[in-house]
Structure formats: structure tokens, C-alpha cells
Amino acid sequence: MPLVTRNIEPRHLCRQTLPSDTSELECRTNITLANVIRQLGSLSKYAEDIFGEICTQASAFASRVNSLAERVDRVQVKVTQLDPKEEEVSLQGINTRKAFRSSTTQDQKLFDRNSLPVPVLETYNSCDAPPPLNNLSPYRDDGKEALKFYTNPSYFFDLWKEKMLQDTKDIMKEKRKHRKEKKDNPNRGNVNPRKIKTRKEEWEKMKMGQEFVESKERLGPSGYSSTLVYQNGSIGSVENVDAASYPPPPQSDSASSPSPSFSEDNLPPPPAEFSYPADNQRGSVLAGPKRTSMVSPSHPPPAPPLSSPPGPKPGFAPPPAPPPPPPMSVPPPLPSMGFGSPGTPPPPSPPSFPPHPDFAAPPPPPPPPAADYPMPPPPLSQPSGGAPPPPPPPPPPGPPPLPFSGADGQPAAPPPPPPSEATKPKSSLPAVSDARSDLLSAIRQGFQLRRVEEQREQEKRDVVGNDVATILSRRIAVEYSDSEDDSSEFDEDDWSD
């Protein structure tokens, strides 16, 4: 329906009740003339309102134009008549002045109570007033106004504001979640794209001939055979594994008893300092996930000739010689190429050097003794007569050895356990359980304490930016902002209680 801003009265000029004692024509004429005069009075009143508003706007516009003209004149004088050679502007004077910043007022609240036109306000005041339900507001427990249940002009604005604030909160939660995922996965943005597979490399290999393709396929990325394996710092090939590819046994050994191969779980790791010499004849047999036997179960390895000392392979330097073994109270066992029982893994023992003087690299750690020699006791059961030999340092640092007691060889008693609750002296004071301890436990468990001044906090939020322009500008700033820091203005606890 159209909104009537100005109503000219009376609407009907001739609709009047005529008296019965006078002439009808004369009465009708007089009544019509009087109503016409009244309508002209209404028109003159509305014309005064219209032209008065136009005059007010014109005067405000004229004042703005005059102010702008004065500023333009001052700027023109400074631009045209200022001589930079005579008048020097100090740097301090420039820094003390504030930069120009225009303050643009946004047009909003177009349909507010204060922006109502005068005729519309008069029409509104002529209507019946709502019942005085606000007198019941002090008796409500929820603190809401009773009149808002009858009529609430700000209902739609409050509904829209709640929706906008909820959307802003959801956007901030999503951005905070993405930032957290980005911090947890720093390499997420640096994902390498998958390489496109083409047959160009294959045709490049086949360009020189089929025999070169096979030789290139055998070699690894560094030019060595693809079957090269590494063990204890040495390089060897599985294809060259034979009886002559292992170091010779010591000269004092007369026989060696073969034993079945061990699995990876029962085989102890060799020390890191002792490695195989990097020559052409020695290698490792670790070609798969499981270790294989170092010797054949039926044939002992023959000793290589000592007339020609092994020369180091070019490109690989032999490892340094280990220090001499410390004195031991227990005579060292004579090593052999056989293994002991699978259930008793041997401890690492000091290395034995070959009698040849030209042999610079140390041999690999000897295997456990055969059944012909007595089994040496483990390091944990050595008597205290002699200091236990320091084991060679493995790659990961192991736990320190247990302390030993006297000559009985038993480990020293562990430190006494802490006194139990039964042995602790009971305090005469009872356990303190008051509101402070409960408060501390609640804070530690992460519970959010209920705010005491919820109403004041809500009033503060309503005062700051409770209009359409501020809410929309905040929403746009949140959506298009790329800052990494979380603003306290959009914190979760600030908008939801």
C-alpha cells in the first residue's frame, strides 16, 4: 500500500448534513466554500514544510560550498606564492602534522524513528498507543522487556544481526582450522608434482644398442652394480660370494665346526668400528631382509694366500685401526668360523689381528667360539677381579652396564624404592578441600568459568558497532583478510556465551 505523507483536509467538500429550516442551495454553497478554504490552508501548510526543508538543505549545501571555496583559496595561495628558496619547511613540522584522512559518513538508518518525515510522524502520533506492558518488565526473571512480546520494531534487525555474527564466527573458525592444519603440516604446500612418465628415456637407452641398455640397467645410480650391498662400511656383491670372499680364520685354529645359519633375530649386531676391508674379494651377503650364513654348512672357508697383500680398492679408504684391547682377567677365547647355539648370542669381543705385517685394515669381528672351547661368561657375570673390557661403541648409544658387587659376581642391589604410602608419616592436618582448590582444578581441566558480568559484557558489545554498516564492514573484512594472527575481536568467547 502507498505511504501517504501529506493528507489534505477536508477530503469531501459537499458531503455535509443540511439543516431543514434553511434553503438547501445557500447552505451547500457556504459549506463548499468553507471546505475549499480549509484545503487551501492545508496546501499552504504543506508547501511551507516542503519549501522550508528545501531551504534548509540549500543553506547546508551553501555552507559546504563556502567552506570548500575558502580551503581552495588557501591552497591556491600556498601553491602559487610559496617560494621554496625563502621558506624552508622543517622535517619536524612535517612529522608533527597528521596526514589527511577523509571521513565518509555512510547513509544508513533511513527508516529510523529520527528520520521520519514530519507528516508521517504526525500520522504515527495520531494512532493508538500500545498497551503499557513495560510496567511488567521489572517482574520478569529473564530481564527482557515485556513490550517486545507484543510489538518489537527491531525484531528483523536483531534476527539479521544474529545471522551475520554467526556467519562471521563460522568463517573465523574455518580460517583458524586451516591455519592450524597448515602449522601441523608445514610441507603440505610444497607438494612435488608427480613426474610424467614418458618413453623418452627408454628410447635414449636403446639408441646405442641393446647391450648398452642391459649394462645400464645393471648399474645403479652411482655406477656400481645394482646388487651391491653394504655391511659395516664395506661394499660387496652378492654375485661374487664364494668361499674365498671371507677373511681367513686365525692361524691358531685347527678345526672349525659348521653350524646351521641363524636368523636375523638370533644374530647379534657387529660393532661399528670393525668393518671388512674394501677390496675386490671381500663383500657382504646381505642381499635381502634376512641375513644368510657367512659360511657354508659343509665346507670351511680356506685361507687366502698371504704372499700378495690385498690392495685397497680405489675410491674407498680402509677404516682406521682400532686401539689395542685392554687387559682382561679372563683369557680371550679362540675364535672360529662356526656359531654357537642359537639361544645364546655371543657378546662382542676384542678383534684379533692377522700375522701378516702388510695387512693394514682390521678383520671383521670374530664369530662366537666353537663347541671345542669353553664358552666365556657374558659381560654381566664377570668377577670384580679385573675391569670389564669396554665394549666397542655401537651406532646407537646403549644403556650403561649394571653395577657389580663383590667377588660373588652378583649385581649390586638396586636403590631402595621410595617409601610407600604405608611407611610415610601421616600428617596430622586434614586434606584441604575448599573452593580455591576446586577452582584451580576447574581451571586445569579447561572448563570455562561462567562470567559474572554477562549483562555488562553484552551491553558493551551492543554499543560497539550495533548498526548495519559496521556489521557488514566487519563481515567483509573477515572474509577477505589474509592475516595469520587471530584477532581478539573475533574470538570465540567474545560472541558466544
Swiss-Prot record:
Subcellular location, record wording: Cytoplasm, Cytoskeleton; Cell projection, Lamellipodium; Basolateral cell membrane
GO (cellular component) term, any one: early endosome
Keywords: Actin-binding, Cell membrane, Cell projection, Cytoplasm, Cytoskeleton, Membrane, Phosphoprotein
Pfam families associated with the record: WH2
Compositional bias segments (type: Pro residues): 298-335, 343-403
Main location: cytoplasm
Phosphoserine, modified sites: S473
Biological processes, Gene Ontology terms: actin cytoskeleton organization; actin filament-based movement; ameboidal-type cell migration; angiogenesis; cell motility; endocytosis; lamellipodium assembly; lamellipodium morphogenesis
Keyword Nucleus assigned: no
Domain annotation WH2: ranges: 435-452
Region feature (Disordered): 173-203, 239-436
Domain description: Binds and activates the Arp2/3 complex via the C-terminal domain. Interacts with actin via the WH2 domain.
Family statement drawn from the similarity comment of this UniProt entry: Belongs to the SCAR/WAVE family.
Subunit description: Binds actin and the Arp2/3 complex. Interacts with BAIAP2. Component of the WAVE2 complex composed of ABI1, CYFIP1/SRA1, NCKAP1/NAP1 (NCKAP1l/HEM1 in hematopoietic cells) and WASF2/WAVE2. Directly interacts with BRK1. Interacts with human cytomegalovirus protein UL135. Interacts with FNBP1L (via the SH3 domain).
Reported function: Downstream effector molecule involved in the transmission of signals from tyrosine kinase receptors and small GTPases to the actin cytoskeleton. Promotes formation of actin filaments. Part of the WAVE complex that regulates lamellipodia formation. The WAVE complex regulates actin filament reorganization via its interaction with the Arp2/3 complex.
Protein name (record): Actin-binding protein WASF2
Species this protein is from: Mus musculus (Mouse)
